[in-house]
Amino acid sequence: MTVAEAETYWTALAGLPRPTLKELFSDAGRLDRYAATLDLPGGPIRFDWSKTHLSAEVEAVFAALASAMDFEGRRAALIEGAKINNTEGRAAEHTAQRGIGNEASVEEAEALHARMRMLVDAIHAGALGEVRSLIHIGIGGSALGPALAIDALTRDGAKVAVHVVSNIDGCALEAAMKACDPATTMIAVASKTFTTTETMTNAASALEWLRENGVADPYGQVVALTAAPEKAVEWGVDETRVLPFSETVGGRYSLWSSIGFPVAMALGWEGFAAFLDGAAAIDRHFIDADLAGNVVVRAAFADLYYTQVRGCQTRAVFAYDERLALLPDYLQQLEMESNGKRVLADGSPLTRPSAPVTWGGVGTDAQHAVFQLLHQGTHLIPVDFLAVKTQGHDLDPAHHQILLSNCFAQGAALMAGKASDDGARAYPGDRPSATILCDDLNPATLGALIAFHEHRTFVSAVMLGINPFDQFGVELGKAIAKQIESGGGEGFDPSTEALLAAVGLAG
């Protein structure tokens, strides 16, 4: 379909009536239509999009656009392992890591998982000596996913204490090393290419730390997680400690591959397997459910409606559970690196807004920081609230009751608003929100939540006609940084040259 042909659907959406949320709720069946509970391996998850401006009329146009953009064909291509990452000539086979995909790719993933399990089980059994800590070194997709999963799922303890280090700032690695005993610490080096500057610099420093602290064979305590195993071996890692993953698994979609090694180390293999099972359950829902009952598709339709029709430039995500504190950061990369594009998949200009800015925080902290703008500011910002029915601590249940009360109150207040003769105390209301309520937070639940957002991001990309699986926008800055590091700090604009001179990096 051409850009001009797609534009007719966007024009139709823009021309539809815009009833308020209160008016939409005059339909007694609205809640049943826009809230759904999925029974998943980790327990039920409720997806409630009733407080958004989605309507039967809006969804009908989106369904027609989805058909015109060959959504079903693109979804099938994703699952079957077709080369849908056309700019790099690759498939995007993260679902195969969860057992959903073409037979050959699933078998390859299962073999790699079996290899990973053998190593994880051996370490936990003490076959490699005493291992109390793991410093996991990666960046971007090699770090954000493991950090989220470990922070969310090990608050009650872990089989091995995992410290995720991503920043090139030495303060990050130094803090991790201070918390570990070199004699009982393993180092995991996670890099798809095994050339990432930040990761390899941190890895070299970690090796030196082991060496300086009396470890006779530092490489004996290193595991490599990479799609370039030959480079890991060349760097010095024993071949038996290299856990490869397929080139067709993108970095920000790689948590399900050997990049999940630190998660398995922390949880044990059963926990990691449950994590995969939860994600696979969402895969099956995404594949099998029709558009009207597909919670993934509905979420993407809402995202697109607010960005493309209502002109919203951001969307906010607030986790009303401390264990999900890192989820907004994870979603920032997933959504903005995937869909923050300026061209269509065929290279022609994208004439509509691409991904909104994704941001957020943790409730109730965020209420005392940014909710003033959400309720009374001039920006319309759709909000996602995430909450967990079962508390994650042993303190007085009043803590959790207050937490959930605040979560649900915010959604109600955004919608209802409050009139006042004093403008400073008036709330306009009619501000959209969606709520995702998990019965419990466990490995399977978290896997389901992440897979839900992966597919949500993919649907938005299909509807816009863009490729969500490349990320060339990150390359220019890295190339310039390497130029500066090699002494080429000349030929820049006056501001950059002055900054380089101020820190002694001028050429």
UniProtKB/Swiss-Prot annotation:
EC numbers on record: 5.3.1.9
Keywords: Cytoplasm, Gluconeogenesis, Glycolysis, Isomerase
UniProt enzyme class: isomerase
Pathway where this protein functions: Carbohydrate biosynthesis; gluconeogenesis; Carbohydrate degradation; glycolysis; D-glyceraldehyde 3-phosphate and glycerone phosphate from D-glucose: step 2/4
Catalytic activity: alpha-D-glucose 6-phosphate = beta-D-fructose 6-phosphate
A cellular component annotation (GO) from this entry: cytosol
GO molecular function: carbohydrate derivative binding; glucose-6-phosphate isomerase activity; monosaccharide binding
GO biological process: gluconeogenesis; glucose 6-phosphate metabolic process; glycolytic process
Intracellular or extracellular location(s): Cytoplasm
Main location: cytoplasm
UniProt record similarity statement: Belongs to the GPI family.
NCBIfam families: PRK00179.1
Role of this protein: Catalyzes the reversible isomerization of glucose-6-phosphate to fructose-6-phosphate.
Name of the protein in question: Glucose-6-phosphate isomerase
Organism whose genome encodes this protein: Novosphingobium aromaticivorans (strain ATCC 700278 / DSM 12444 / CCUG 56034 / CIP 105152 / NBRC 16084 / F199)
Organism lineage: Bacteria, Pseudomonadati, Pseudomonadota, Alphaproteobacteria, Sphingomonadales
